[in-house]
């Protein structure tokens, strides 16, 4: 699986996806446009370090985004290089895990939007359902037990190198 993740075509598609998202630079200050020549020059070195288990993501850049209620949402922005690697991993894990998710789940899933979720709620209302629960769990990701997540990942991903890469690139952000 790691070979498929790091394959040039998958990595290039990942970069294009990161570029399309137009995100801000990470802690290194490298923009999306600056990352392309860097990746072209250093992709082999990066992939070699990943294969050897020696790749360490950069620290995330911490920012606070104002919320409508006056509070702030704290975000960690990875570097463009790390986001590209995260996207490359995601592109290969989504086909494995997408079929396992509940049909009524819409958050952070491909080809599902907030509008789709609203249409589903409308459908439930038309079927006679009259109650709904709205939740916004404070600091939810920060409170997840990452060991449980990694063990769930191991059930379907037998390549331990991928499990370790996910642990470093996704769960430390």
Residue spans of the language-model regions?
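Conserved small/polar residues in nucleotide/adenosyl-binding loops
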Residues: 169-173
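Active-site palm subdomain of RNA-directed nucleic acid polymerases
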Residues: 90-102, 130-131
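Conserved catalytic palm subdomain of right-hand nucleotidyl-transferase polymerases, strongest
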Residues: 24-27, 31, 76, 115-153
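Non-catalytic, polymerase-adjacent accessory regions of viral genome-replication enzymes
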Residues: 1-40
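A residue-level signal for conserved active-site and pocket-lining positions in enzyme catalytic cores
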Residues: 26, 65, 89, 121, ...
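Hydrophobic (often cysteine-bearing) scaffold residues that line and stabilize catalytic clefts
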Residues: 38-39, 77, 81-85, 93, ...
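Short, conserved non-catalytic motifs in the polymerase core
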Residues: 20-34, 57-84, 100-113, 133
